[in-house]
Regions:
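Flexible "arm" and connector segments at domain edges
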Residues: 1-62, 68-205, 210-272
């Protein structure tokens, strides 16, 4: 692998390249924080895909794209005389040192769980830091990830089930309430009744999903990763179903559910 000097040279190289692009390229020159934001989200999702697929070469490329965006935002901040890349890095370094007193000072921790609790506690005491436990969870996060992060933040200050097994009563309770509202929605007569029942059912569905996320978290599972794996599995099997149907000269719309299930089970048996 590369030496520290080579790493610093590479970092200096990208800084020089971006300086030149910002000055001489019409597209790069007109970019703003706002115009870059959707592209940044896309790059992060592409990075996530590379991680999930275990493609190391692709991971290296996608990390570079994300790094470019970090440096780009810092360059824009520098042009506005608000901050530059040195401020960004120093702020990060100071934060890491402050939040790891068990590494850089004399504090002691018993394990990873204590580190997380210490991290959350220190965040609330920082100057200009997040003074509320949940203020560090962005509103723009996807709902599943947001639920997980909110629950994890609350856990960091002790707001959690005493025993993980207790969560199942809550899951069953929320599932029952959701089913009851679905029944009420089916029995509704007027449009107003249907609208009100739909709203209540949606609310209870949210509670049920939130409780399910909690159950996953308490057992050390990441629901976002789990659902991503299931989506990938569904894609593989459905693609197999489509391909086999085409090979037979048929169309999915013309097949019975039993016929599709049979091909689906074939794909499942093949480990797809």
């Amino acid at each position: 692998m590369h030496t520290r000097e080579e790493k610093l040279q590479a970092f200096g190289r990208i800084l020089d390249i971006l300086d030149e692009l910002r000055e001489k390229c019409p597209w790069d020159r007109k970019q703003t924080n706002e115009s870059l934001r959707p592209q940044t989200l896309e790059e992060v999702y592409e990075l996530s895909d590379a991680i999930l697929k275990g493609e190391e070469r692709e991971l290296s490329k996608e990390l570079g794209d994300v790094l470019l965006h970090v440096i780009f935002y810092a360059k824009i901040g520098e042009e506005k005389q608000h901050f530059d890349i040195v401020d960004v890095i120093n702020f990060l370094c100071d934060k890491l040192i402050y939040r790891h007193p068990h590494v850089f000072s004399t504090a002691e921790v018993g394990g990873a769980e204590d580190v997380i609790k210490q991290w959350e506690m220190l965040k609330t005491t920082e100057k200009d830091g997040n003074k509320r436990v949940l203020s560090g969870v962005p509103d723009g996060l996807p709902p599943l990830l947001k639920a997980y992060r909110m629950q994890d933040k609350a856990r960091g200050v002790g707001f959690d089930w005493e025993k993980k097994e207790q969560v199942w009563d809550k899951v069953k309770e929320e599932m029952g309430e959701y089913q009851a509202e679905l029944d009420a929605m089916a029995a509704a007569q007027t449009e107003d009744e249907k609208a009100a029942a739909y709203d209540r059912a949606e609310d209870e569905l949210g509670d049920f999903l939130f409780a399910t996320v909690n159950a996953a978290r308490l057992y050390g599972l990441n629901p976002d990763t789990a659902l991503e794996r299931t989506c990938a599995k569904f894609r593989r099997r459905f693609t197999y179903l489509e391909e086999q149907t085409i090979r037979k000269g048929r169309n999915l719309k013309d097949m019975t559910l039993a016929e599709m299930d049979a091909i689906w089970d074939e794909g499942k048996a093949k480990g797809l």
